[in-house]
């Protein structure tokens, strides 16, 4: 998942791109859960925090300008698919190398994937 600046009518707006693996044939609910994990992980990974996550009621996050704009402009997301784990890694590396904010989700395999940790 990445936050991606998108040019529209000469005005730059921030959109979030979520990339999912098609080859896993995840149930719809599982896909939604993984996308939600990705959104939250990316937000927390790329915010300025001085928090102990075990004290969730006191969560305090400082947002940079891009994240603030994304939150204030409606949380726009673009969802894409890749055909394989290799394609997911390639997309991740290309986005990271371009300076975009990226996060990878590794599922524990508790409800799907036969107990095997899997990058979704």
Where do the PLM segments sit?
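Positively charged, small/polar-rich N-terminal and surface patches that mediate targeting and assembly
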Residues: 1-120
């Amino acid at each position: 998942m990445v936050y991606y600046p998108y040019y529209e009518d000469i005005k730059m707006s921030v959109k979030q791109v979520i990339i999912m693996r098609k080859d896993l044939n995840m149930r719809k609910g599982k896909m939604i859960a993984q996308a939600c994990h990705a959104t939250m992980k990316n937000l927390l990974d790329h915010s300025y925090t001085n928090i102990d996550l075990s004290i969730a009621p006191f969560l305090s996050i400082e947002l940079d300008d891009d994240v603030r704009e994304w939150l204030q402009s409606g949380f726009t997301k673009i969802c894409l698919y890749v055909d394989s784990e290799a394609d997911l890694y390639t997309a991740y590396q290309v986005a990271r190398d371009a300076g975009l904010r990226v996060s990878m989700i590794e599922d524990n395999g508790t409800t799907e994937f036969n107990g095997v940790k899997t990058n979704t």
